[in-house]
Structure formats: structure tokens, C-alpha cells
Amino acid sequence: MSNPILLGIFWHFIGAASAACFYAPFKQVKNWSWETMWSLGGFFSWIILPWSISWWLLPDFWRYYGSFDMATLLPIFLFGAMWGIGNINYGLTMRYLGMSMGIGIAIGVTLIIGTLMTPVLQGKFSVLFGSPGGQMTLLGVLVAVIGVAIVSYAGLLKERALGIRAEEFSLKKGLILAVMCGIFSAGMSFAMDAAKPMHTAAQALGINSLYVALPSYVVIMGGGAIVNLGFCFIRLATCKGISLKADLAQAKPLLIANALFAILGGVMWYLQFFFYAWGHANIPADYTYISWMLHMSFYVLCGGIVGLLFKEWKAVGQKPVRMLVLGCVVIILAANIVGLGMAV
């Protein structure tokens, strides 16, 4: 396995670790509605950071974006909005299925759809079955799905041991939302593929290959921001029991602490895709669709590791922990299979 491929896998792991940890600062926010907290964190992760970093990277910010026609930008933006819808469905999935089953189904679906639909849309799917490297990467995707399923089962055992139930358990609603979440969340993978002309243009300007994907985030995350912020603002304006005015009426020290924690959560959220771009840059051109599989499977892996480190599995018994460790090992095996497939 070559060094660039190993680096690509490593950076995807770092990005996934940031994704697994980003909600920790949000948990420190007190006496704010979820909508206010998510909007502030999201404003930094979807707007401030993508724009600031692109402004710093690009020699002429406005000329760069003005060089693309609407036929190029609109699909990227819409795929970003599609991914934003997936974000909203994610929370609803947890409500109706619980964390473990919800994550298992949603991540499993988005891993498969986001990974395999890209080569299908490119007309390259049959090529994967006809080459040893393609066959091995497909095997790695299958093993990753199995690993995600095992970790999710471990989480289900943990929830049962701790007596945790979904807020409003509904298998029918939850399954529909989980599948929708998985499909729509794959929009980020499609957006990255559609943004290749933007990556090429950034590289032509002399931008380091590790950073060429970052300017496209202005458009991709712009689509996601409109969906997420619109959803939050509508709820703040129409739902009884929550209001921006009430959230901002808290004592000044609490306001400052809440704002800092929300911003930190937003920064950590953005870092997952910052390092996703680094990992993506090191993946061979014929296998860029694998980036999504690596990111999502490592996200589940890192979520399990973070749970162990924070002693969330302390009182659940040995079987759930053994299943968690087994699932993590299977995901690591999947990453190695995919890496070997890309190296063939």
C-alpha cells in the first residue's frame, strides 16, 4: 500500500474523529433551545469557516467563483441542500428509533448509496467488477457495512442494559426517516463529485492539492446552510416553548459560555470535512468514491472509541463491549481491504 493511500486513509480517520467528537461542546450549552445552539454553531461551520478559508486560499475570491456558470454551480448547491435535508432527518431518526438502531440504518444506507452511486452515475460501476482492485474495494465496502451493523448491535445491547428507549419509538416512521436520512446525507458525496471542475480550477491557480476541495465548500455548505438555518428559524418563529428572545435573555456569563461552546462545536464539525478534503486528495482518481465509505465507517468506529474513553459503556456488561470491539476491528479490516484494493 503506497504512502499517499495510507495518508488518505489516515486523514479520513482524523476527520471522522472530529465528527465523532463535535457534539461534546454542544452538550455543555445550557438553557438554550437546540435550534439556537445549532444555528450559531452551523453559522460558523457552514458559512464563516468555508468563506474565510477560501478567501485566504484563493488569489481572487470573486473571480474564482464568477468563472463558473450556473450549470456547474447549481448541481453542487442542490446536492449540498440534499445533504442538509439528511442532517435534519438524522435527528428525527434518533427520536423514533433510538441512537443505535437509527445510526446503524442511517449510516449503513448513506455509506452504500454515497459510495456506490457515484461510480454508477459515472458509468464506471461495471468496471469495478471487472478489475481485481475494484472487486477488492467492493469487498471492503461490504465488510464496512457489516462492521457498522455490529457496532450498531452493540449499541442496541448497551441501550437495553441501561434501560434507554427512543423518545417516541415508532418502527415504521423511524425506518422511513432512517432510509431518507441515508439517501439525502449521501448528497455530500455527490456534491464532491460534481465539484471536480472547481477542484481542477483551484489546482490551476497553484493551490496545494490538499486544499483544492475547500473552495467548493462555499457552495456545498451554502446549500446545506439554507436548509438547516431555514428549518431552525421557522421553528424558532412558530413553535411554542422556544424563542430566540428567551434564549438571548440569559445572564451574560451564560450567554458567553453558550456561544463559545456552540462555536467550538461548529468548528469541530467543519474540521471533519477539512480533513475529508485532505484524505480525498490522497485517494487515487479512479477510487475517489471510496472517500465516503472511509469517512462514514470511521465515523462509527470513532464514535465507539469516544464512547469507551468517556466510560459510556462502563455499566453495560461484557457482551456489548465485546461486540463493540469486534465491530471496530471489522471496520479497521474494511479500511485495510479498501486500501489494498486501491493499491492493486
Swiss-Prot record:
InterPro entries registered for this protein in UniProt: L-rhamnose-proton_sym_RhaT
Location relative to the cell: Cell inner membrane
Gene Ontology MF: a single term: rhamnose transmembrane transporter activity
Main localization category: membrane
Reactions accelerated catalytically: L-rhamnopyranose(in) + H(+)(in) = L-rhamnopyranose(out) + H(+)(out)
Segments crossing the lipid bilayer: 4-24, 38-58, 68-88, 101-121, 137-157, 175-195, 214-234, 255-275, 290-310, 324-344
Keyword Cell inner membrane: yes
Coiled-coil features, chain-numbered ranges: none
Entry GO terms, CC: plasma membrane
Mode of membrane association: Multi-pass membrane protein
Domain of life, source organism: Bacteria
Keywords carried by this UniProt record: Cell inner membrane, Cell membrane, Membrane, Sugar transport, Symport, Transmembrane, Transmembrane helix, Transport
Pfam families: RhaT
Protein family (similarity comment): Belongs to the L-rhamnose transporter (TC 2.A.7.6) family.
NCBIfam families in the record: PRK13499.1-1, PRK13499.1-3
Known role: Uptake of L-rhamnose across the cytoplasmic membrane with the concomitant transport of protons into the cell (symport system).
Protein name: L-rhamnose-proton symporter
Origin species: Pectobacterium atrosepticum (strain SCRI 1043 / ATCC BAA-672)
